[in-house]
From Swiss-Prot:
Gene3D superfamilies: BH3618-like (2.30.290.10). It is found in: Cytoplasm. It comes from Wolinella succinogenes (strain ATCC 29543 / DSM 1740 / CCUG 13145 / JCM 31913 / LMG 7466 / NCTC 11488 / FDC 602W) (Vibrio succinogenes). It comes from the Bacteria. Belongs to the FliW family. The keyword Cytoplasm applies. GO terms for cellular component: cytoplasm. Acts as an anti-CsrA protein, binds CsrA and prevents it from repressing translation of its target genes, one of which is flagellin. Binds to flagellin and participates in the assembly of the flagellum. This is Flagellar assembly factor FliW 1.
Length: 128
């Protein structure tokens, strides 16, 4: 499904639209529409750990999120070899509103979410 990015994706400010493809219940990928060579791996944080945060009001307004909206959350992953050394950024989740195909990334404060990190090893959460 193609989403319009309503706020810049950190490090990829030129991306305005991307295709979201779910790989399985844990992983997904986004591929930039204007540059298909840009592909980012995502993880469903709820499949990995207990994960909760408040979506800021400005993001709710930007994505037209209300109590009935179908919202999904993913976090970026830096893939490593071996895969269990891959890193998940829990402090900058991507928010997807499936109702209107819009998305945005937010930067959470480590002060507000001290249990989250920008580079948690995935092996800390995946049971073998």
């Amino acid at each position: 499904m193609v989403y319009e990015l309503k706020s810049p994706l950190l490090g990829f400010e030129e991306i305005k639209e991307f295709d979201l493809v779910e790989v399985d219940e844990m992983f997904a990928k986004i591929k930039a529409i204007n540059n298909p060579s840009i592909e980012i791996t995502l993880a469903n944080p709820y499949a990995l750990r207990e994960y909760s945060f408040d979506i800021p009001a400005y993001i709710q307004a930007l994505l037209d999120i209300n109590a009935q909206s179908k919202v999904r959350v993913f976090c970026t992953v830096v893939i490593q070899n071996p895969i269990d050394e891959s890193r998940v950024n829990f402090l900058a989740p991507l928010i997807f509103n499936d109702d209107n195909q819009t998305a945005a990334q937010i930067a959470l404060s480590i002060k507000d979410y001290p249990d989250f990190s920008v580079a948690d090893k995935i092996k800390n959460y995946v049971k073998e």
